[in-house]
Amino acid sequence: MGYTCFCIMNTASSSSPACGVPAISGRIVGGTDAVYGEWPWQVAVTTANSLCGGSLINEQWVLSAAHCFDNSISPGNYKVSLGRYKFGESIASSVTVVVEKFTKHPNFIKPGDRGDIALVKLKSPVTFTNYIRPICLPNASVTFPSGMECWVTGWGTRRYGENLPSINTLQEVMTPLIDYKQCDQMYHIDSSTSSYTIIIQEDKICSGYAEGGKDSCQGDSGGPLVCEANGTWIQAGIVSWGDGCALKNHPGVYTLVPAYESWIKSYISDVKFVSDDQISGSPDLAPQHCGLSRNLYQASCVLICMNMTYA
């Protein structure tokens, strides 16, 4: 039993919100279910037979993993659900949009390769709400230090090999970052792969614990790995692959987003990227980095606390 608090923010303007700033916050440390509206950039990318995650980066574009998309399947057969909390259950805040096109990075050929990143254009733009908001993207200058605690979210399975449930609450887990060199060393422990063979490439970042226990899993692919800096959430990675789920010395592997700034910009000219200076908290470089006026970020917060019991 304990108190869970939600912060409902009332912005001073009805214009587009800043990226990476959820209207609702509240987290149960060590829990698994996310708070409704806590991760408003999280999307589900689905076909009749598949589920992946993704992140909203502006009104009409989503970032996901290349391995989630099959070139033999028409883009119109992919759908993107936004503002959703329980997968498989429609609510008033959620919308579903058909995909107009998807673009996979040319370096990607098969899972485990470099370039496991895809841009997804929605057939029509979405309206931002408290439950549908974009995530901030880091530019190529941004580095994410090992040990930084970040969050991964998705509707995937909780254990490797499980079938995806028909209705599943959005899950969240916090894990520390691991740089690709250290991660590569971990994957070589008790491995038959030669130590001279690179398993984790430089366009990746890992997140997890040496002892295992917390990780993304099946169905989470393409979803965001996000880190908080001065009240703004930045997407560090995209769920790419892993050996099982949450195994010892096998942390989750993510495509490193800042490595692909120029590629993303080549397709989306108006997407805004955050720099190291903006993340460091300079008073002149706060959330207005998304190209919006400063008065958008003058906000009041109504705090609602509920006494809840968890099994």
In which residue ranges do the predicted regions lie?
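Extracellular/periplasmic catalytic domains that process cell-envelope and extracellular macromolecules
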Residues: A34-E38, L56, S72-S74, I91, ...
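Extracellular trypsin-like serine protease catalytic domains
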Residues: G20-V29, Q42-T46, M148, G154-T157, ...
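Solvent-exposed coil/turn segments that connect beta secondary-structure elements
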Residues: A48, H67, G83-K86, N107, ...
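Conserved H-D interstitial segment of serine endopeptidase catalytic domains
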Residues: V21-S25, V62-A65, F69-K110, Y180-H188
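Short conserved beta-strand and strand-loop elements enriched in small hydrophobics
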Residues: V43-V45, Y78-G88, L137, E149-G154
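Protease-domain processing segments flanking chymotrypsin-fold serine proteases, especially trypsin-like
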Residues: M1-L63, N77-K79, R84, S275-A311
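Active-site substrate-binding loop(s) of clan PA
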Residues: P106-I109, P125-M174
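Conserved active-site neighborhood of the chymotrypsin/trypsin-like protease fold
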Residues: V62-A66, R114-N139
